[in-house]
Design a protein with these regions (language model features):
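Small-residue-centered hinge/linker elements
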Residues: 4, 10-144, 153-244
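Glycine-rich beta-to-alpha transition loops that act as phosphate-gripper elements at the mouths
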Residues: 147-155, 256-259
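Secondary-structure end/capping motifs
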Residues: 237-267
Length: 267
């Protein structure tokens, strides 16, 4: 019998399907102490040890305390919701928490695999790749499977991380793909500053140190530099997709023009 354990940060509940029980802490009520005693008795009876929760800003920051025992085999369920970025306190996806949780699961002998639910438009190249590598490490060291389920969207970085999955499932209304890399928008406000009578001065150690500045023109050389960085990241993306989907790189390049695909198209 293999249950599931939800490690997500969306609410203050701990959920499992061992015995069909769910537990939620209540505060400020006269029955609080009685409820806690009853829950503890039930947990001891069925051999479940509930891990300690720490909360930061109302969000669950960690659901693992040391080498926790779940009292039986289980599959971890993780959510990747929102932009995949390296911001520990973001309200949706928490990169530090996710990386820590996956690393802890490696040493959890009761864990038998991971299911990741994705609803993300993507994120930074760095954090997407770091999460992908952590999942590949988990698979390599544990020989356990990783499954993905695509919800509303799993695009760009959200698709990238799924290349670590053994299997991918998607809602029929999912939008995915968007295989590509881009810089942030580069603005040129020199014309506006001229109209306002504002002049700027920047002292640099080299002609390309200030490239991308809103107050200087992007030269052909600088455009080539930025394009080379984008191309390098794109080539890495293509390689990851080719490996994860068992496709040739040439075929991936044919379809990886940045567009999104429906679930049926991506299949």
């Amino acid at each position: 019998y293999i249950g599931y354990r939800d490690y997500n940060m969306r609410d203050n509940n701990i959920k499992d399907n061992h015995g069909g029980k769910s537990r939620q802490s209540t505060k400020g009520q006269n029955s609080w102490l009685i409820a806690v005693i009853v829950v503890l008795v039930l947990m001891l009876t069925i051999g479940i040890v509930v891990t300690t929760l720490a909360y930061i800003g109302g969000a669950r920051f960690s659901s693992i305390s040391g080498k926790s025992s779940f009292g039986g085999n289980s599959v971890a369920v993780l959510d990747v919701q929102g932009e995949i970025g390296d911001v520990s306190a973001r309200a949706t996806y928490n990169h530090d928490w996710t990386m820590h949780t996956i690393n802890e699961l490696i040493d959890d002998s009761s864990n038998k695999g991971i299911v990741i639910r994705v609803n993300s438009p993507g994120g930074s190249v760095y954090t997407s790749d770091e999460l992908y590598e952590e999942l590949m490490k988990y698979k390599s060291e544990t020989k356990r499977p990783v499954y993905f389920y695509f919800q509303d969207q799993a695009a760009s970085g959200g698709y990238y991380i799924a290349m670590a999955g053994d299997k991918i499932y998607a809602n029929r209304n999912t939008w995915t793909g968007s295989i590509g890399v881009k810089t942030g928008t580069l603005y040129d406000v020199r014309g506006l500053l001229d109209k306002l009578g504002i002049k700027t001065n920047t002292i640099t150690s080299g002609r390309n140190k200030a490239m991308g500045s809103m107050t200087t023109e992007l030269t052909d050389e600088q455009r080539e530099i930025l394009q080379s960085l984008i191309d390098e990241a794109y080539n890495q993306f293509v390689t990851i997709v080719a490996k994860g989907r068992n496709m040739s790189e040439s075929r991936v390049r044919e379809i990886a023009d940045g567009r999104v695909y429906s679930a049926s198209q991506a299949k």
